[in-house]
C-alpha cells in the first residue's frame, strides 16, 4: 500500500527534510562511500529496458529517480536494497506477488537504494480520474522534490513520467532516455535542466 499524506503541513515538512545541506547542493556525492553518485548511459539503458519489458507484460512499477533534493525521508519508509541498478533487479522487485513489489523504488545514482517506499499522493484536480494510485503518487513526489518518477501502468502497460508536478503520459523510450539524460554526474559543471528554472 502507498500511504496517503493529506495535510499540506506534513508534506511541506517532508519537503524541507529532503533538502540537501550547503555542500550537497553543489556536489552529487554519496558521502557514505566517498564517491560521486554517477548516473551513466548504462544505468539509463537498464532503466529504460526494465520499464518497457515490464510494460509488455503489464507489470506495474513506480520508480523515483533522485535528483538534487535528497529523498531520505521517503527512503526510510521502505526496505533497504542498495544494489547496482540493472533491468533484471527492477523486474524482480516489481514482479507480482513478491515481497517488494508494492510501493515505490528509489534510485540514487547507479543504485537502487530502497523499495516498497511510501509516497505522498497529489491532490491535484487536473489528474485524470482514470489514473490510479501509482500515477497520483508519482505526481505527488514530483510536487515536493525535483525527482523524475517513472510509472508503468498495470492496466495498460504504458509508461508515463512525472516531473515538476506534471504527468507526461504514454511516453516512448527515446523521450524517457532524453529526460533521464538530465540526471547529472556532478552539479559543479552542468547547467540545471529547464524544469528547475524559475
Task: Tell what function each PLM region has.
Residues 6-9, 13-187:
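Divalent-cation
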Residues 188-194:
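Conserved small/polar residues in nucleotide/adenosyl-binding loops
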